[in-house]
Amino acid sequence: RYGSPTYFYAFYHHCQSLMKPAWSDAAHGDEVPYVFGVPMVGPTDLFPCNFSKNDVMLSAVVMTYWTNFAKTGDPNKPVPQDTKFIHTKANRFEEVAWSKYNPRDQLYLHIGLKPRVRDHYRATKVAFWKHLVPHLYNLHDMFHYTSTTTKVPLRIPPTAPTSPAGPMARPGAPSGQPSHLPTATRMPRGPGTGTRMQGHSW
């Protein structure tokens, strides 16, 4: 948006520890020990992991990307990916070029033991929230549309039941008062209290 290069990544690796079994996925912040080279030092109180050679290699890769970006704004240069000091063969990151992110292609780097450049991060989940949910919400509004030109007919209140002798009277009610109407009763006062709210009995 402002002309500065943007590089998008998703970290898909985590160290092995008792707190995080092998079948679990990477979580937010799992790249932190790799950024600061913890696998090269060994387990710490903060990161009690069983670091392998692959963890050391991945840490070297991440530190190279981060320091390159800090120096030049491009994680691919000036220092190329090279971890032969850890493995006898080249790692796959040496064959991957981390592309810039743009709204059209939406490329990002999948960082893990099998790195690759992918596009449209979590496209299905993003489409659900950006397109399907708003669409369903708009359908809800369509079915609850209130007309601005059609008036709702007025409801006529029901009349009191009548008998040949006139309105039906409730036993004990004053003469001429229909039985369906409530009578107001006053709640008793408590000691030292003011007037109570009035209730109705049917």
Curated annotation (Swiss-Prot):
Subunit structure: Homodimer, and heterodimer with NLGN1 and NLGN2. Interacts with neurexins NRXN1, NRXN2 and NRXN3. Interaction with neurexins is mediated by heparan sulfate glycan modification on neurexin. Interacts (via its C-terminus) with DLG4/PSD-95 (via PDZ domain 3).
Name of the protein in its database record: Neuroligin-3
A family per Pfam: COesterase
Keywords, in A-Z order: Cell adhesion, Cell membrane, Disulfide bond, Glycoprotein, Membrane, Synapse
Keyword Cell membrane: yes
Function, as annotated: Cell surface protein involved in cell-cell-interactions via its interactions with neurexin family members. Plays a role in synapse function and synaptic signal transmission, and probably mediates its effects by recruiting and clustering other synaptic proteins. May promote the initial formation of synapses, but is not essential for this. May also play a role in glia-glia or glia-neuron interactions in the developing peripheral nervous system.
InterPro entries per the UniProt record, alphabetical: AB_hydrolase_fold (IPR029058), CarbesteraseB (IPR002018), Neuroligin/BSAL (IPR051093), Nlgn (IPR000460)
Cellular component terms (Gene Ontology): neuron to neuron synapse; plasma membrane
Residues bearing carbohydrate: 50
Extracellular topological domain: 1-202
PANTHER family: NEUROLIGIN
Family: Belongs to the type-B carboxylesterase/lipase family.
Region annotated Disordered, chain positions: 154-202
An example Gene Ontology molecular-function term: neurexin family protein binding
Entry annotated with the keyword Disulfide bond: yes
Main location: membrane
Disulfide bonds: 15-49
Membrane topology summary: Single-pass type I membrane protein
